[in-house]
Amino acid sequence: MYLKRNIINMQRSFSRQFHISVRNSIQSSKPLSNSTPLKGCSVGTILIRSPILTRQPSEFEKSIYKYNAELWNELSDPLPAEFYFKKGSVGEKDWQERQKTLKGKESPFETIFGKERKEMESNKLLDSATHLQSRVTEADTKNDERSTLRSLDKSLYLLVKKSKSSGWQFPNTPVTSSEKALHLLCQDLLKNILDENSLTWLVARHPLALLKTEQEKTFLLRARLLNGLDVPNLQNVYDWVWCTYDELKNKLSPSSWDSVKNILSDRL
């Protein structure tokens, strides 16, 4: 009992001394001036145009879908023809004829509805909006990297060049004062390079990645481009490109690519 009381007193004494030392150190430290520039520090934005189309399935996925469809057809219950067709009726004879033509066919759709499909295609509406559009756009054909209308099934990331001699990098701006939060600086940055009508959404207020060099540290925040199909020319930059994930490796510096390759993906 005596030993336990001594241990409790020692813990209280240590805790009291620790809090006093922390309070004294805080009081003795000088407050950081809000107007002090943060040298070698900048904030950037990973601006993403989200995928617009679903991705194309791989050959392996296509084979799985085909196998599952065939298996489902084999395991499905046969149609109770005696319930739907009267014995000896014209409908029963037509049904039996169609069943004979289905033997050995992988898909019975064309055999059963082939005639109806041709009639439907011959009576197409004149409105072009009802027709299927190609997944390959004009920007894909011309390899226009400035357009957001390319690679519609993948995410696109904005890279800029500040001058002719500089390399490709994410849009960034130096942090000249500690009075403004990082996410507010990112919003001002996007307003500076994009049109005022462009709509963006900052995903979070905290940094997603850190690009660190000997001269500078760049904190990256993530933002999404909401009007991804109508992006005007960028302002206050020398050049810009919208890159897929695979193209980032060839554009960014090796150190920058190593910092972001594990936090970005082909479809983000």
UniProtKB/Swiss-Prot annotation:
Keywords linked to the UniProt accession: Mitochondrion, Ribonucleoprotein, Ribosomal protein, Transit peptide
Xref: CDD domains: NUDIX_MRP_L46
Transit peptide as UniProt keyword: yes
Domain of life (superkingdom): Eukaryota
Gene Ontology cellular component annotations, sorted alphabetically: mitochondrial large ribosomal subunit; mitochondrion
Disulphide-bridged cysteine pairs: none
Transit peptide boundaries: 1-25
Cell compartment(s), UniProt: Mitochondrion
Pfam family, one: MRP-L46
Molecular function per GO: structural constituent of ribosome
Assembly mode: Component of the mitochondrial large ribosomal subunit (mt-LSU). Mature yeast 74S mitochondrial ribosomes consist of a small (37S) and a large (54S) subunit. The 37S small subunit contains a 15S ribosomal RNA (15S mt-rRNA) and at least 32 different proteins. The 54S large subunit contains a 21S rRNA (21S mt-rRNA) and at least 45 different proteins.
Task performed by this protein: Component of the mitochondrial ribosome (mitoribosome), a dedicated translation machinery responsible for the synthesis of mitochondrial genome-encoded proteins, including at least some of the essential transmembrane subunits of the mitochondrial respiratory chain. The mitoribosomes are attached to the mitochondrial inner membrane and translation products are cotranslationally integrated into the membrane.
Similarity annotation: Belongs to the mitochondrion-specific ribosomal protein mL46 family.
Designated name of the protein: Large ribosomal subunit protein mL46
Organism of this sequence: Schizosaccharomyces pombe (strain 972 / ATCC 24843)
